[in-house]
A protein has these predicted regions:
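Thiamine diphosphate
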Residues: 1-160, 165
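Glycine-/acidic-rich phosphate or pyrophosphate-binding loops and their flanking alpha/beta elements
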Residues: 5-19, 39-40, 145-156, 165-212
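Short beta-strand elements in bilobed, periplasmic/extracellular small-molecule ligand-binding domains
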Residues: 214-217
């Protein structure tokens, strides 16, 4: 399968889940073509809310929808979501609202969008909040399974996605398990931990390290 950005995988998975779970609603802050929530918007226009460039209002509205029994996915660039950190903290985290925040354009690999759009501090900030789960899938397979897990999980979640295409690293029979690491390659000298968009690059780094003499050889 050709490389695919996890934001694209998210859009495809969300559109498919919309058929199965009718309580899913989606909100976006004028970036649906970039976050890929536009796929859901076109298929379910009555369950999609374009909030404009007003992330704070979007997050508060998502919290209200969650408290009313809906499953809201609120989407924007990761860097714009954390700019409304206090609203996330008070309206979502402290109330344990069942809101799914989706932050795209994570990390530095966002191409021509530039440094002002990079989500760099979001993992540290979102991990500090009570009740929140943070999920950063590494490829198409994991992303699609993670989106379904998130929809069924009760509680706030931050889903961190990439703009840049990623190669698949997980096998076709991969099964997503929250909080459980996956061993992609065995070895004995070096352990490399990675998450999200750098998993594939970490595997490449491991291949380069194999060319060096082992201390056990």
């Amino acid at each position: 399968m050709p490389a695919k950005a996890t934001r694209v995988s998210f859009g495809e998975a969300l559109e498919e889940l919309g058929e199965k779970i009718r309580d899913i609603v989606v909100l976006d802050a004028d970036l649906s073509k970039s976050t890929m929530s536009i796929k859901f918007a076109k298929k379910f226009p009555d369950r999609f809310f374009e909030m404009g460039i007003a992330e704070q209002n979007m997050i508060g509205t998502a919290a209200g929808l969650a408290l009313a029994g809906k499953i809201p996915f609120a989407c924007s660039f990761a860097c714009f979501l954390i700019g409304r950190y206090e609203t996330i903290r008070m309206s979502v985290a402290y109330t344990n609202a069942n809101v799914k925040l989706v932050g795209t354009h994570a990390g530095i690999g966002i191409g021509e969008d530039g440094y002002s759009q990079m989500g760099l501090e979001d993992i540290a900030l979102m991990r500090a909040l009570p009740n929140f789960s943070v999920i950063q899938p590494c490829d198409d397979i994991e992303t699609k399974q993670a989106v379904e897990y998130i929809a069924l999980h009760q509680g706030p979640v931050f889903l961190r996605l990439t703009r840049q295409p990623l190669e698949d690293v997980n096998p076709p029979d991969y099964k997503f398990q929250f909080g459980k690491g996956v061993i992609l390659k065995d070895g004995k000298d070096v352990t490399i931990f990675a998450t999200g968009g750098v998993v594939f690059n970490s595997l490449l780094a491991g291949e380069k390290l194999e060319k060096f003499p082992s201390q056990h050889s």
